[in-house]
Each structure stands twice: as C-alpha cells, then as structure tokens.
C-alpha cells in the first residue's frame, strides 16, 4: 500500500484540479504511442497510427486519453486505496486486453512529462515526486492481477 503525506496529496490535487483531461490525456497517450511504438499494437482498431502527426491528430487517441485520465481521477480521489480502486481495470487489462503491465509504468512516466510541460514552474520537484509516487502506485495496482 502506498502512503501519501498531506503535502503530497495537496501537490497532486492542486495540479489535478487544473488538468484539461482531453488535452493532457490525448497528448500523454499520443506521446506514448510515438515514443514507444510497440505499444501501438494495443490500439490497432484506432485507425491511422502511421506517423506522429496522424497519432497526435487522431480523435480516438484523444478520446481514449481522456478516458484514461478520467480513470486516473479515481486515483486522485482514492490515493489511500489504489489496489481496490483499480482491481476491475487490472482484471480487464490482464484477462481481456492482455496488455503488458510494463506499459502502465511507461504511460505514468509519460504523464509526468506532459504535466511538467503544461504546468512549467508550477510543477515543482516536490509536485513531480508526488505525481511519480502516484503513477507508480497506479501502475502497481493495475499490474496486481498479473501476479
């Protein structure tokens, strides 16, 4: 179980409250597919993924990125109970989608990079540490069914 201090929770929620789910989610997922092209195999029904421009302009990528960040909002609201919060999604990604659990870590790291880009100086080292802790906790919770 991951324990978050009051300061870490505040750092996470202060950024989260300002996140544009569609923009940040779409960019995060799009960058994941560009930087780690082997992840594209999980999105073969999403249409044209032939170039960075095609990926970043793909409305299905943007929509799914928003969906991913909407789910991440559950983590922000349930930081002290990540394993139970993501039990269903862990089962879905393991049993039905057969997603590589390593990709959860890659996506989390990509989100931290995108948040840093969007929030600049407001995304302090302390905020980054708190967010990194959160995305690692979420990746671990999503990977639980695999063990």
UniProtKB/Swiss-Prot annotation:
Protein's recorded name: Hemoglobin subunit beta-H0
Domain Globin: 3-147
InterPro entries the record matches: Globin (IPR000971), Globin-like_sf (IPR009050), Globin/Proto (IPR012292), Hemoglobin_b (IPR002337), Hemoglobin_oxygen_transport (IPR050056)
Gene Ontology CC annotation, any one: hemoglobin complex
Gene Ontology molecular function, alphabetical: heme binding; hemoglobin alpha binding; metal ion binding; oxygen binding; oxygen carrier activity
Tissue-specificity statement: Red blood cells.
Keywords assigned: Heme, Iron, Metal-binding, Oxygen transport, Transport
Gene that produces this protein: Hbb-bh0
Subunit structure: Heterotetramer of two alpha chains and two beta chains.
Family note: Belongs to the globin family.
PROSITE patterns, per database record: GLOBIN
Annotated function: This is a minor early embryonic beta chain.
Binding site for heme b: 64, 93
Cited PANTHER family: HEMOGLOBIN FAMILY MEMBER (PTHR11442), HEMOGLOBIN SUBUNIT BETA-H0 (PTHR11442:SF47)
Organism: Mus musculus
Domain of life: Eukaryota
């Amino acid at each position: 179980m991951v324990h978050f201090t009051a300061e870490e929770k505040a750092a996470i929620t202060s950024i989260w409250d300002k996140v544009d789910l569609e923009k940040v989610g779409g960019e995060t997922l799009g960058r994941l597919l560009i930087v780690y092209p082997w992840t594209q195999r999980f999105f073969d029904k999403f249409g044209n993924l032939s170039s960075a421009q095609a990926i970043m302009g793909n409305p299905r990528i943007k929509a799914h990125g928003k969906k991913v960040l909407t789910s991440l909002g559950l983590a922000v609201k349930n930081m002290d109970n990540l394993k139970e919060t993501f039990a269903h999604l862990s089962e879905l990604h393991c049993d039905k989608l057969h997603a590589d659990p390593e990709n959860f870590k890659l996506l989390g790291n990509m989100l931290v990079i995108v948040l840093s880009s969007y929030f600049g100086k407001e995304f302090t080292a302390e905020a980054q540490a708190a967010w990194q802790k959160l995305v690692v906790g979420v990746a671990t919770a999503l990977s639980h069914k695999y063990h």
